[in-house]
Swiss-Prot record:
Keyword Cytoplasm: yes
Annotated PROSITE patterns: WD_REPEATS_1, WD_REPEATS_2, WD_REPEATS_REGION
Protein's recorded name: Histone acetyltransferase type B subunit 2
Domain of life where this protein originates: Eukaryota
GO CC annotations on file: cytoplasm; nucleus; Rpd3L complex; Rpd3L-Expanded complex
Function summary: Regulatory subunit of the histone acetylase B (HAT-B) complex. The complex acetylates 'Lys-12' of histone H4 which is required for telomeric silencing.
Main location: cytoplasm
Molecular function per GO: histone binding
Gene symbol of the encoding locus: hat-2
Annotated GO biological process: chromatin remodeling; regulation of DNA-templated transcription
Record's compositionally biased regions (Basic and acidic residues): 437-446
Phylogenetic classification of the source organism: Eukaryota, Fungi, Dikarya, Ascomycota, Pezizomycotina
Length: 446
């Protein structure tokens, strides 16, 4: 046997050993998280999907059935199946138990708390979340991203792996798949696949997309004339020099669109300007690796967050984009998803390849800490969700139930959960929390 073949075998064996050691560590961390979870969550559901989803979003509606102890919410999901298997755009119904008035008779002596994850209401019913897929719509290839139109949530846009942007009207499809993908409209313009997709919250029928072909495209469904199922973009931007990873309309300023790229820049387009080869604002030198996502603060119009492969999150103030206002450090791998809390303007969620979803409270930046607290992370690190054992793919805040989150990992695991009120409430909890086991990395709490 040649010497280089022996070296190759050694390298392979070392890689296998490293992978096994990493998996053992992941499994151990998961066991610790599972043991601690009754103290960390008011409710939790982990469900194994048939296939992983790369995308998740709560629909804006909620039903409140009479004489029922739950509310009914809906989720938008996709699939990422194995080679040769069909893919679907999926809609799920989720029954969320109503939070009951705490009753001293529900006190759990073993855990030393009232109510909480896994407890029962005074009626004796367990506080359990129920999940079921209610509609499957055929989709060509995996769903890179799916988002509903805010003005009409039955209209859904998806990013396909061939670069097409597909528009589906959910009401025009049966609840079971037909076997043939049949979107209402195909938006043609990108030459490569992408993950950047965002509807215009100010104008119905308009959306923006970003792609690995380095372009940002604007679309206006109102220009569709019905002669074919295809529609061309209304405007093409070429201001980035590398892959465009994420795009977002500003939620408060109609003419602004934010874009981020592997070229390490955050850029702001002003659609009122005629030029399409440069942005109105360019923020450089904020990150040392690709910028994967951005999020405009929905309540403070000048604040933007960026997520990077350099493991950090940048906080920017649009009044001075020469440098970041602050850097959030706590993830151990690339940060890939960002979303601000829908009602708490200082709360930001971030998902990462490190399998963690972190909650940050920007209002705590600079707060004094004890040495013990500092070991758990910076003062603005509010909470660490450690329930996933694979890369975070996407997550979504529920707009009808504060602090209710859906998170999806690149394995089949989908989790629907609500962090314990004692951790995120402004006032300290009345009852002390028992001492938790010490996971690595540490769970962050008050």
């Amino acid at each position: 046997m040649a010497r280089d073949e022996i070296v190759d075998d050694v390298d392979v064996n070392m890689e296998e050993d490293d992978a096994e050691a990493e998996q053992r560590l992941i499994n151990e961390e998961y066991k610790i998280w599972k043991k601690n979870s009754p103290f960390l969550y008011d409710m939790m559901l982990s469900t194994a999907l048939e296939w992983p989803t790369l995308t998740t979003q709560w629909f804006p509606d909620v039903k409140n059935p009479k004489d029922k102890s739950h509310t009914v919410h809906r989720l938008l999901l996709g699939t990422h199946t194995a080679e040769g298997k069909p893919n679907y755009l999926q809609i799920a119904e989720v029954e969320i138990p109503k939070m009951v008035e705490l009753n001293p008779r529900d006190y759990d002596e073993e855990r030393g708390e009232i109510g909480g994850y896994g407890s029962k209401a005074s009626s004796g019913e367990p506080l359990c979340i129920r999940f079921k897929i209610t509609q499957k719509i055929d989709h060509p290839g995996e769903v890179n991203k799916a988002r509903y139109q805010p003005q009409n949530p039955d209209i859904i846009a998806t990013l396909a792996v061939d670069g097409r942007v597909l528009i589906f009207d959910r009401t025009k499809h049966s609840i079971t798949p037909s076997g043939t993908p049949s979107p209402q409209l195909e938006l043609i313009g990108h030459k490569e696949e992408g993950f950047g997709l965002n509807w215009n919250p100010h104008e119905e029928g308009c959306l923006v997309t970003g792609s690995e072909d380095k372009t940002v495209l604007l679309w206006d469904l109102k220009t569709y004339e019905g002669t074919s199922k295809q529609l061309k973009y209304s405007r093409k931007y070429t201001h980035h020099s590398h892959i465009v990873n994420d795009v977002q309309h500003h939620p408060l300023v109609k003419s602004w669109i934010g874009t981020v790229s592997d070229d390490l820049t955050l850029q702001i387009i002003d659609v009122r300007r005629p030029e399409t080869d440069k942005a109105a604002i360019v923020a450089r030198n904020g990150h040392s690796d690709a910028i994967n996502a951005l999020a405009f603060n929905p309540r403070v119009e000048t604040i933007i967050a960026t997520a990077s492969a350099d493991k950090t999150i940048g906080i920017w103030d649009m009044r001075n984009m020469k440098s970041k206002v602050h850097t959030l450090e706590g993830h151990q791998d690339a940060v890939t998803s960002l979303e601000w809390h829908p009602t708490e303007s200082a709360i930001l969620g971030s998902g990462s390849y490190d399998r963690r979803l972190l909650f940050w409270d920007i209002s705590r930046v600079g707060d004094e800490q004890t040495q013990d607290d500092a070991e758990d992370g910076p003062p603005e690190l509010l909470f660490m969700h450690g329930g996933h054992t694979n890369h975070l793919a996407d997550f979504s805040w529920n707009r009808n139930d504060p602090w209710l989150v859906c998170s999806a990992a690149e394995d089949n695991l989908l989790q629907i959960w609500k962090v314990a009120n004692s951790i995120v409430s402004k006032e300290p909890a009345d009852m002390s929390t028992p001492e938790l086991d010490d996971p690595k990395p540490k769970q962050s709490s008050h």
